[in-house]
Amino acid sequence: MYAVIQSGGKQHRVAVEQTLRLEKLDVEAGETIEFDKVLLVANAEDVKVGIPYVEGSKVTAEVVAHGRGNKIKIVKFRRRKHSRTTAGHRQWFTEVKITAINA
């Protein structure tokens, strides 16, 4: 069984016992969180597609940790001017483990 949830402006295909990184959520590590924006729920027999969300379904997950991703370098180079600017960015994320899918 799998589901497609919406979190942080992105859509994620999730299954039970799967861990994934989402955009940073304001939840402490070790707590449980419920995603009610479920776009699709599928098992071996049938598929439920929401318009836009599947009613009465939710995905439960446990927050494992918070962290920051790998550094991305941003370089702005101005030709013939002997000038360049470099910057870096590390995006915050929340790592969650899916515990249940209720359809």
From Swiss-Prot:
GO MF term list: rRNA binding; structural constituent of ribosome
Domain of life: Bacteria
Bilayer-spanning residue ranges: none
InterPro entries: bL21-like, bL21-like_sf, Ribosomal_bL21, Ribosomal_bL21_CS
Keywords annotated in UniProt: Ribonucleoprotein, Ribosomal protein, RNA-binding, rRNA-binding
GO cellular component entries: cytoplasm; ribonucleoprotein complex; ribosome
GO term, biological process aspect, one: translation
Protein family according to the UniProt entry: Belongs to the bacterial ribosomal protein bL21 family.
Subunit structure: Part of the 50S ribosomal subunit. Contacts protein L20.
Function: This protein binds to 23S rRNA in the presence of protein L20.
Name the UniProt record assigns to this protein: Large ribosomal subunit protein bL21
